[in-house]
């Protein structure tokens, strides 16, 4: 009998019962909540007269709608100008109080983007099933977790039962061996993967990321890669547990202590695919060949190395891709064959659940130090992923580096990743962004998003256009 993959092990460990249709009832260890997908779920509980099944499994924080300007944040929820956003944040606050759920509120130092806060607090632990009403929940798979996003009706179901009906995915291994070159980051790795397999390449699969590149990669880097598994079409992305994983978790607020810690570590050390495990699909890349990446179009798969030009229609693989590229040229205001360096940028955004952790901010600061934002850039902003990330960056003096260069240093939140708060692009503006999606209107109506790493975004802010950070 063949060995098990990591996904198989996690799935089997959480099956409560198997149903006649082949689906399974899975037990959920951790449920993370935010203000956008939870109001109707809480209302459903209230109407049915139910209480959360296991209070301690649920933790909430507002992130999508919170303002990132200090002036507004100092006023708390009342400082949120948009009525809908304010109501959503207030409703989360009210619901958490009514149901006695732990919430890191808008001015709590622990508040931040839910996928930054979970690992930071030790709420995300190896071997867990982790769900959240947010598609980028795959981030937590970096800890050897089975983590994925859920819809609002499922949020209610998890609150009420601590279980979820799911159908098992197939197994895919994405193996990246070799050593990354100077200036090549985890963000470039995952963009290169998506560029290779496309945004539907992982559909129906749980992706395990393996190989030397991931063994060498930091935990925060692994979070960046797993975060964008959904952009590759997979709900689930994960990396096997190793010593780095355990060291990262150790001592965090919600991590086990004492004898429980020793028992947990013994289990966590089993969380890897067996050597004889069989995957349904295997994708391989050579890490040494990956360059800094820049997305040029309106899908994450429309991505190329910074050294290349916008592809021409002759390079498209079929009529569907030709049509997609033609529409993307028009929306993005680009020409086929245009050099990336010729794209005039208007704004730079360094933040989001993909790239707002302390390592990301350090990488950007290293590029920015002693330089100035180009006069042609209307706005360059750094948005830490949590209050604690912000605090650590300020302790290291990174905020001063950015402020002296002409960047804005903001309060934590989802910010310009999506047009659900005050941080938005204007129509026609080009933005170098460390976020995860570049769909039409994602950062604001008519806004044009280019996905890059923190180092590439920082270099673009200084130059006013895209440059190869390796020679910057």
UniProtKB/Swiss-Prot annotation:
Q: Which domain of life is it from?
A: Bacteria
List the catalytic activities from the record. (2R,3S)-3-isopropylmalate = (2S)-2-isopropylmalate
Cofactor remark from the record: Binds 1 [4Fe-4S] cluster per subunit.
Q: What does this protein do?
A: Catalyzes the isomerization between 2-isopropylmalate and 3-isopropylmalate, via the formation of 2-isopropylmaleate.
| Quaternary structure (record) | Heterodimer of LeuC and LeuD.
InterPro entries per the record? 3-IsopropMal_deHydase_lsu, Acnase/IPM_dHydase_lsu_aba_1/3, Acoase/IPM_deHydtase_lsu_aba, Aconitase_4Fe-4S_BS, Aconitase_4Fe-4S_dom, IPM_dehydratase_rel_enz, IPMI_cat
Descriptive protein name: 3-isopropylmalate dehydratase large subunit
- Pathway assigned to this chain's UniProt record: Amino-acid biosynthesis; L-leucine biosynthesis; L-leucine from 3-methyl-2-oxobutanoate: step 2/4
PANTHER family noted in UniProt? 3-ISOPROPYLMALATE DEHYDRATASE, HOMOACONITASE, MITOCHONDRIAL-RELATED
Q: Mind listing the GO biological process terms from this record?
A: L-leucine biosynthetic process
Q: Name one GO molecular function term.
A: 3-isopropylmalate dehydratase activity
Q: What is the scientific name of the source organism?
A: Acinetobacter baumannii (strain ACICU)
Keywords, ordered alphabetically: 4Fe-4S, Amino-acid biosynthesis, Branched-chain amino acid biosynthesis, Iron, Iron-sulfur, Leucine biosynthesis, Lyase, Metal-binding
Query: What family, per the record?
Result: Belongs to the aconitase/IPM isomerase family. LeuC type 1 subfamily.
- The transmembrane segments are none
Please name the NCBIfam families in this protein's record: leuC, PRK05478.1, PRK12466.1
User: What SUPFAM superfamilies does this protein's entry cite?
Assistant: Aconitase iron-sulfur domain
Gene3D superfamilies from the xrefs? Aconitase, domain 3 (3.30.499.10)
According to its UniProt record, the EC number is: 4.2.1.33
Q: Which residues bind [4Fe-4S] cluster per the record?
A: 353, 414, 417
Cofactors that this protein relies on:
[4Fe-4S] cluster
């Amino acid at each position: 009998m063949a060995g098990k993959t990591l996904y198989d092990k996690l799935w089997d460990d959480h099956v409560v019962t198997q149903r006649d249709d082949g689906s399974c009832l899975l037990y959920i260890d951790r449920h993370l909540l935010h203000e956008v997908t939870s109001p109707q779920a809480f209302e459903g509980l209230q109407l049915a007269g139910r209480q959360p099944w296991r209070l301690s499994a649920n933790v909430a924080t507002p992130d999508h709608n919170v303002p990132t300007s200090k002036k507004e944040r100092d006023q708390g929820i009342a400082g949120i100008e948009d009525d809908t956003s304010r109501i959503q944040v207030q409703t989360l606050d009210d619901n958490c109080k009514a149901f006695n759920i732990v919430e890191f509120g808008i001015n709590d130092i622990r508040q931040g983007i839910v996928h930054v806060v979970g690992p930071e607090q030790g709420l995300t632990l190896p071997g867990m099933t982790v769900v959240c009403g947010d598609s980028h929940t795959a981030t937590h798979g970096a800890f050897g977790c089975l983590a994925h996003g859920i819809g609002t009706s499922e949020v209610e179901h998890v609150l009420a039962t601590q279980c979820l009906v799911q159908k098992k995915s197939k197994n895919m291994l994405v193996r990246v061996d070799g050593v990354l070159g100077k200036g090549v980051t985890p963000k470039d790795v995952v963009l290169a993967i998506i560029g290779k397999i496309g945004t539907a390449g992982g559909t129906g699969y749980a992706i395990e990321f393996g190989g030397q590149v991931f063994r060498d990669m930091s935990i925060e880097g692994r979070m960046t890669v797993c975060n964008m598994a959904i952009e590759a079409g997979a709900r689930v992305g994960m990396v096997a547990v190793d010593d780095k994983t355990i060291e990262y978790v150790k001592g965090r607020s919600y991590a086990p202590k004492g004898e429980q810690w020793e028992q947990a570590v013994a289990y966590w050390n089993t969380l890897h695919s067996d050597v004889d495990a069989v995957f349904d699909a295997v994708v391989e890349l050579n890490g040494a060949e990956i360059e800094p990446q820049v997305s040029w179009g309106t899908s994450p798969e429309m991505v190329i190395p910074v050294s290349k030009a916008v592809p021409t229609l002759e390079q498209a693989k079929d009529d569907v891709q030709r049509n997609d590229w033609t529409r993307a040229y028009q929306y993005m205001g680009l020409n086929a064959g245009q050099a990336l360096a010729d794209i005039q940028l208007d704004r730079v955004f360094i933040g989001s659940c993909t790239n707002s952790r302390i390592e990301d901010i350090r990488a950007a600061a290293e590029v920015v130090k002693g330089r100035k934002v180009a006069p042609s850039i209307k706005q360059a902003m750094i948005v830490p992923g949590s209050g604690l990330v912000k605090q650590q960056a300020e302790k290291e003096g990174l905020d001063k580096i950015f402020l002296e260069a002409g960047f804005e240093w903001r309060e934590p939140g989802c910010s310009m990743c999506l047009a659900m708060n005050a941080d938005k692009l204007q129509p026609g503006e080009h933005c170098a962004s460390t976020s995860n999606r570049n769909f039409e209107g994602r950062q604001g109506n008519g806004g044009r998003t280019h996905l890059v790493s923190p180092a590439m975004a920082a270099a673009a802010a200084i130059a006013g256009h895209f440059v190869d950070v390796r020679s910057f």
